[in-house]
């Protein structure tokens, strides 16, 4: 395929690439014909002003593809036949390169969002489809997995609008009418006609131009940042709100979006009042006042805003036409001023200070001459609002044909043109008009009179008395200087009308558009009413009327001098955040930050953000404080509400970079006992199936350690991997929704023990590796298959082999609530079926069908399936409201026992063996938690009866050095005595079914029994560890005596030496040790210190 440079010139596209599209046709013969002629291409190129941009070539004979491209600007087909999900039989996939392959060539449809209005999203063949063995009639669900996994979905409200929209009749604007015109009109405000002459009179030409350039620097940097963000992907409607929210996230976007929309709504009132004041001045001159100045402003303002609302509601096309007419009037007014500067002035104008271009006047006005109370920054504060308005085009981003191209071109060109105009007007008016003039033609200088050396004196006028008394004319005194200088004064008045009305109209359109986008994202609950759009252009009519009400309210107040500085600061706050967004996205180094507009710099953007914040305080410090307070309040509100959106913001990207940097930094830090914290692997299976196990672990890892909920999928890898992958996101989401600070990890393995081994070795990252294994006690060990028992005890051995501590948790009812969840699932399915039937009834107008199905519902009501089932991902406590029947309500209550606040009680710590201190550290951490803070620690340790007091003092001293508070210390001196006969008999009856009794057999028979049942407990083994068995039984007696009323018991876990103690005997030890007790934690550290008393 050849590549050539486009030669012709037509309007440019937003794409930055050269692309050749070859249509292979629908017939295979055309694709593989041996005698096919060399391809001939019909070329379509898009603009010589943008080299290395889009160039597309089509084969002849495919007019449909060519027409589709001209309409949408995209190179790929949008035929709905490509939605066929049976990609094994879809011939499109088999023709990607003209030979038999399911792999698809790159297409734009694969990268669209689900609700894209430019065309439907197409699902590429999944990895499983092209990797698994080929099977007939394999179908893929309509939702592609890669969309969910990579988070390129859209908010729920946009998904609800996922429809094929008829685009005919939709009005879209190019960069000139959509951005350039609007920005120029908004930047050229009344300041150009009635305040610029005063500014240059106060600051002089030098500082006046500096003020203009400083303002331009702020807006130019913001324009560059806006351009970079706008070209980093497809831009929807919403303007500044959309740019900020998709860059920094909903917290910043939501807070600035609301105040930005409000600022635009109030700005409508400000501009309309400015227009009304000018009209009232004209009425005063002609002595045609209606009531009084204040009420006349209200009457004229109200009528004006009603007319502007009518233009806006009529549609964007009418509003755009009105803007073009107003721009023409404004340009004529500006041209009229420049023409007036070269028309020789008459005596009346000279007496008012206008002498045409004079070098002496230019020299005199070049330096500053600040009056009392004015300075550089005060004058700058007055001028800067005139430079704003650069987001007028971006605010209607949803109505632009190509926002990525229009926003940068229109905004930057508008800034350049308006800046040149401001500087030109400032220099010209300062070169023609003196600062002070009396307006009296009698002040001419008669020959022979002394001259004070001023420029006016040299030109024949003596305005020296203006130094002692106020004068009415000149740059410093007359706000109508431009009207006086112009060739035809009424045109300047028309220009003022044009500037105020165009700015009001732009704000009246911007506010509803931004507010509609904010409401669509549903960040602020309750504002969804204003998200609805009407007509082809999705016009926010409800937003228009809301803006009208706000504008009308402030017009009727007619006191805008107080609110004006706050509104200016609202705009500046949005500029600051746009600059910060650009910096933040660059600093986060996300691969997704790839703006097509490369003329920006992250540090310049940061400087622009700081500059905007500084200008806010320069303009009005108290208004800046109010702006920050309001924005902070809204930010905190949105953060607290946590809107369910995922926009891939730079905040998320920076979180990843920070986490990565910190994890890497952590690898350089050596382990120290003072920094030890429990980092736990918890074998919960699915987190929702064993909530109590997760709750107790989370209690001592929350905010202080790592918690990984692990699940092992046992079985054929092919089946297990599919099941595992399908549920990982859902289970992690369950943890997040239930506010459990933990990760979810899963592995697929041939057996449970192999999976746990993999988790023990590979889980974690760097220093954040697990050091503790938490498992639930296997309550059904006597009924479980032998292989399960071997795996259970085996993973304890494996943990010790990897030098990982072990915590076994036992509660009386057990942990697994899967039976309850199964009932819940069944109820949910029944509820869904019921709702589906009800929906069918509403759609079906047949009375017979209604009666028959409703009869079924009455019967179903008796079965209790008409009540909505509780949500599965809710708190486990909600399950209690279900009708679980025979599925053991006690199990449900037990599963939620660690969610509740523990009353006043004790945590009894039986620190029998020194394991490095983990047995003591875990209960101490528990007492720091809100739910356990009312529980006191009671410490139990073994000792000699003859030295109880000495050992008690010694242990108290050790705990004091560890800085661990305790309520009491008990030294148990009778641990090693034999247990009661009744207790020992219970233990013997427990192990009886598993004993070999080989000592009563001859040697041959005994050896045979050992070979046939190697898992059974031999007499020799039982005799060898008899003292240890006595100890376990005796400990249970002591626990029953001392800790039966405790809230929690933490007990040293006995260790079974490998090869010496069988699995069944070890489980019997754990059973008899923890039998008939409150919740128990059996803890054994890795015998490395986790406590220290050194500083």
Curated annotation (Swiss-Prot):
Name of the protein described by the UniProt record: Solute carrier family 12 member 1
Main localization (coarse): membrane
Modified residue annotations for Phosphoserine: 57, 87, 116, 126, 144
Glycosylated residues (UniProt): 442, 452
Similarity-based family: Belongs to the SLC12A transporter family.
Motif RFXV motif positions after renumbering to this chain: 16-19
Cytoplasmic compartment segments: 1-173, 219-255, 320-323, 397-413, 627-1095
Keyword Cytoplasm assigned: no
Gene Ontology molecular-function annotations: sodium:potassium:chloride symporter activity
Ion transport is among the record's keywords: yes
Topology feature Extracellular, residues: 195-197, 277-298, 345-375, 435-546, 589-605
């Amino acid at each position: 395929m050849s590549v050539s440079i486009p030669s012709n010139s037509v309007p440019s596209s937003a794409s930055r690439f050269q692309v050749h599209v070859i249509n292979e046709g629908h017939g295979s013969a055309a694709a593989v014909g041996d005698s096919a002629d060399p391809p001939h291409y019909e070329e379509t190129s898009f603009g010589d002003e943008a080299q290395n941009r889009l160039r597309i070539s089509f084969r002849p004979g495919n007019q449909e593809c060519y027409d589709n491209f001209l309409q949408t600007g995209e190179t790929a087909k949008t035929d709905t036949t490509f939605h066929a999900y049976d990609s094994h039989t879809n011939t499109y996939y088999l023709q990607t390169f003209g030979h038999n392959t399911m792999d698809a060539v790159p297409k734009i449809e694969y990268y669209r969002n689900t609700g894209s209005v430019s065309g439907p999203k197409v699902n590429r063949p999944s990895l499983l489809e092209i990797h698994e063995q080929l099977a007939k009639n394999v179908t893929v669900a309509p939702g592609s997995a890669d969309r969910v996994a990579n988070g390129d979905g859209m908010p729920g409200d946009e998904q609800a609008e996922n429809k094929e929209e008829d685009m005919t009749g939709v009005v879209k604007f190019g960069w000139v009418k959509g951005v350039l015109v609007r920005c120029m009109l908004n930047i050229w405000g009344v300041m150009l006609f009635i305040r610029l002459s005063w500014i240059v009179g106060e600051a002089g030409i030098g500082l006046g131009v500096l003020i203009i350039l400083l303002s331009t620097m702020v807006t130019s940097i913001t324009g560059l940042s806006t351009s970079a963000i706008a070209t980093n992907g497809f831009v929807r409607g919403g303007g500044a709100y959309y740019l900020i929210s998709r860059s920094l996230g909903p917290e910043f976007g939501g807070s600035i979006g609301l105040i930005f929309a409000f600022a635009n709504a109030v700005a409508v009132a400000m501009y309309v009042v400015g227009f009304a004041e000018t009209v009232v001045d004209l009425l005063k001159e002609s002595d045609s006042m209606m009531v009084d100045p204040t009420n006349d402003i209200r009457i004229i303002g109200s009528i004006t805003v009603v007319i502007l609302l009518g233009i806006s509601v009529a549609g964007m096309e009418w509003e755009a036409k009105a803007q073009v007419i107003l721009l023409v009037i404004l340009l004529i007014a500006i041209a009229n001023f420049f023409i007036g500067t070269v028309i020789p002035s008459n005596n009346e104008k000279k007496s008012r200070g206008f002498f045409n271009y004079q070098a002496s006047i230019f020299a005199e006005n070049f330096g500053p001459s600040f009056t009392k109370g004015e300075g550089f920054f005060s004058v700058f504060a007055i001028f800067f609002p005139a430079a704003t308005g650069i987001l007028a085009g971006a605010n209607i981003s949803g109505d632009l044909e190509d926002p990525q191209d229009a926003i940068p071109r229109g905004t930057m060109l508008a800034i350049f043109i308006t800046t040149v105009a401001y500087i030109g007007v400032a220099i010209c008016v300062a070169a023609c008009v003196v600062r002070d003039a009396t307006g009296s033609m009698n002040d001419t200088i008669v020959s022979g009179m002394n001259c004070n050396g001023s420029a006016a004196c040299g030109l024949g006028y003596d305005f020296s008395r203006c130094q002692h008394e106020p004068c009415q004319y000149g740059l410093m005194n007359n706000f109508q200087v431009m009207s006086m200088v112009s060739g035809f004064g009424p045109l300047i008045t028309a220009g003022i009308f044009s500037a105020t009305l165009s700015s009001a109209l732009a704000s009246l359109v911007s506010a509803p558009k931004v507010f509609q986008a904010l409401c669509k994202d549903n960040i602020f609950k309750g504002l969804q009413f204003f998200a609805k759009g009407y007509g082809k252009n999705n016009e926010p009519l409800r937003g228009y009327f809301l803006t009208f009400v706000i504008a009308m309210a402030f017009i009727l107040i007619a006191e805008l001098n107080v609110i004006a500085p706050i509104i200016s600061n609202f705009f500046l706050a949005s500029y600051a955040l746009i600059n910060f967004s650009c910096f933040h996205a660059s600093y986060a180094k996300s691969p997704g930050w790839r703006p097509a507009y490369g003329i920006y710099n992250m540090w310049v953007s940061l400087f622009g953000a700081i500059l905007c914040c500084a200008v806010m305080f320069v303009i009005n410090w108290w208004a800046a404080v109010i702006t920050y307070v309001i924005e902070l309040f809204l930010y905190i509100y949105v953060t607290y509400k946590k809107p369910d959106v995922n926009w891939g913001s730079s905040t998320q990207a920076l979180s990843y970079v920070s986490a990565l940097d910190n994890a890497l930094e952590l690898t350089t830090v050596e382990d120290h006992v003072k920094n030890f914290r429990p980092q736990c692997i918890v074998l919960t299976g699915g987190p929702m199936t064993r909530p109590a196990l997760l709750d107790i672990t989370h209690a001592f890892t929350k905010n202080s350690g790592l918690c990984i909920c692990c699940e092992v999928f046992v079985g054929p890898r092919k089946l297990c991997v599919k099941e595992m992958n399908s549920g990982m996101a859902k289970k992690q989401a369950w943890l997040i929704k239930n506010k459990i600070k933990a990760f979810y990890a899963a592995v697929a393995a041939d057996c449970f023990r192999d999976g746990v081994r993999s988790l023990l070795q590979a889980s974690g990252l760097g220093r954040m590796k697990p050091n503790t294994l938490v498992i639930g006690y296997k309550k059904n060990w006597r009924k479980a298959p032998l292989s399960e028992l071997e795996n259970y005890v085996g993973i304890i051995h494996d943990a010790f082999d990897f030098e990982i501590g072990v915590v076994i948790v036992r509660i009386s009812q057990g942990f697994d609530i899967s039976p309850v969840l199964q009932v819940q699932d069944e109820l949910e399915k029944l509820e869904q079926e019921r709702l589906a039937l009800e929906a069918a009834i509403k759609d079906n107008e047949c009375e017979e069908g209604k009666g028959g199905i409703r009869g079924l519902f009455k019967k179903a009501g008796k079965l209790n399936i008409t009540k909505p089932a509780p949500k599965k991902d809710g708190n486990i406590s909600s399950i209690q409201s279900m009708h679980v029947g025979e599925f053991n309500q006690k199990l449900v209550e037990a599963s939620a026992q660690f969610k509740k606040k523990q009353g006043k009680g004790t945590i009894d710590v039986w620190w029998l063996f020194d394991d490095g201190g983990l047995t003591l550290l875990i209960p101490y951490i528990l007492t720091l938690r809100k739910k356990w803070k009312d529980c006191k620690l009671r410490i139990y340790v073994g000792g000699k009866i003859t030295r109880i007091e000495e050992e008690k003092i010694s242990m108290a001293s050790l705990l004091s050095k560890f800085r661990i508070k305790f309520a009491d210390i008990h030294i148990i001196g009778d641990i090693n005595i034999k247990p009661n006969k009744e207790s020992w008999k219970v233990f013997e009856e427990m192990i009886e079914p598993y004993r070999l009794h080989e000592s009563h057999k001859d040697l041959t028979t005994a050896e045979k029994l050992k070979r046939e049942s190697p898992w059974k407990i031999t007499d020799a083994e039982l005799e060898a560890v008899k003292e240890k068995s006595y100890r376990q039984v005796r400990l249970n007696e002591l626990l029953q005596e001392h800790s039966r009323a405790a809230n929690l018991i933490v007990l040293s876990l006995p260790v079974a030496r490998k090869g010496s103690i069988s699995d069944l005997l070890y489980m019997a030890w754990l059973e008899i040790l923890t039998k008939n007790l409150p919740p128990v934690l059996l803890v054994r550290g890795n015998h490395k210190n986790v406590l220290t008393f050194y500083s």
